[in-house]
């Protein structure tokens, strides 16, 4: 009976180590931004008409500002927007289908 308890304890220890290794490797990977939006700073400020404007991000990027909405002068970070393409297919009988791909 003691040998069976030892075997169960050994199996639990091995499975706990395996699960711990799986979770710790996932936490250490960072999100890497690549492309035109990488390391681009954007700005929110008031223009000459007193309206809030956001500038600094290239086309296809979104400016994310981590300040409250009541703060007019703030800096943010540009992130790439998810892009999708549409594929249009025409069959021999003349029907057309469109599919969006991400």
From Swiss-Prot:
Identification of the protein by name: Complement inhibitor RaCI3
GO molecular-function term, one example from the UniProt record: toxin activity
Function: Complement inhibitor. Prevents complement-mediated C5 activation by binding to C5. Binds C5 at a different binding site than the other tick complement inhibitors OmCI and CirpT1, and the drug eculizumab. Inhibits complement in human and guinea pig but not in other species tested (rabbit, rat, mouse, and pig).
Localization in the cell: Secreted
Disulfide bonds: 37-61, 42-63, 57-78
UniProt note on tissues of expression: Expressed in salivary glands.
Top-level lineage group: Eukaryota
Family: Belongs to the RaCI family.
Signal peptide: 1-24
GO cellular component: extracellular region
UniProt entry keywords in alphabetical sequence: Complement system impairing toxin, Disulfide bond, Secreted, Signal, Toxin
